[in-house]
Curated annotation (Swiss-Prot):
Function: Required during biogenesis of c-type cytochromes (cytochrome c6 and cytochrome f) at the step of heme attachment.
Residues annotated as transmembrane: 13-33, 46-66, 73-93, 101-121, 145-165, 233-253, 262-282, 294-314
Entry protein name: Cytochrome c biogenesis protein CcsA
Keyword Electron transport applies: no
Coiled-coil ranges from the UniProt annotation: none
NCBIfam families: cytochr_II_ccsB (TIGR03144)
Topology of this chain in the membrane: Multi-pass membrane protein
Amino acid sequence: MIFSILEHILTHISFSVVSIVLTIYFLTFLVNLDEIIGFFDSSDKGIIITFFGITGLLFTRWIYSGHFPLSNLYESLIFLAWAFSIIHMVSYFNKKKKKNLNAITAPSAIFIQGFAASGLLNMPQSAILVPALQSQWLMMHVSMMILGYGALLCGSLLSIALLVITFRKVGPTFLKKNLKKKFLLNELFSFDVLYYINEKNSILLQQNINFSFSRNYYRYQLIEQLDFLSFRIISLGFIFLTIGILSGAVWANETWGSYWNWDPKETWAFITWTIFAIYLHIKTNRNVKGINSAIVAAIGFLLIWICYFGVNLLGIGLHSYGSFTSS
């Protein structure tokens, strides 16, 4: 009873804090950041509180059940939210690159934890593991897979942001309009009047060109930073995913007598692994633009959710014990 009450308290604390943090981030888009810089820094500390809240929640279920809390969909979602909070904390201590990651990790953590705590998923009480999960490989395999999902989702979202910024039309339209006006003025006014008007226009035109170049330079810098962060995080997630698949193969051989059975979960995990292997291969080719790898990462984003929720929705295969019906 005490563990159940403590679990509910930690769940509500972490969810409430991360909700406040997300609200602060949205406010920073509406208000000048320099005016509320202290408010913004306090939101970063809020994610740290969320991290400890989720950590306490996981430890509470661990102590109460006697096994690592990754036996059902609810626990895996909480662990995924915990993974996003870890990524956020890493970016918090890396001051140069934290803002772009914060815009991804905070909303992701609140949506995942919100879904886990919603009415769609009942909060199951910790219970004895089913025979298929009673193995020392549970912590190794599932934790690596979830950490891999978290890092790959975060990196893929950064790539999607890169695509949005890249395809957004930003150009010196003011320059084109002024050139058209110049041709019309040449037809209507005398030389003295034109000289005065052209002087005024040249000043405005130069100011707009400087602004346009400055804006495009900032846009280019942002795209480069997103591409760099996406590559680093996806590389880390790919390592976790590889370790998770290999450890799962060893576990499958001990439990079912074969390393690979091609059930839905294994098949989609292999497809996801292949897509991100293609992403990393593209990144090693300097002749290929970053936009191509970002498109591959965006495809990988969809595949991760299919791999993560697909089997849970179907409730079939060797991994069906984590389905919605069983959680």
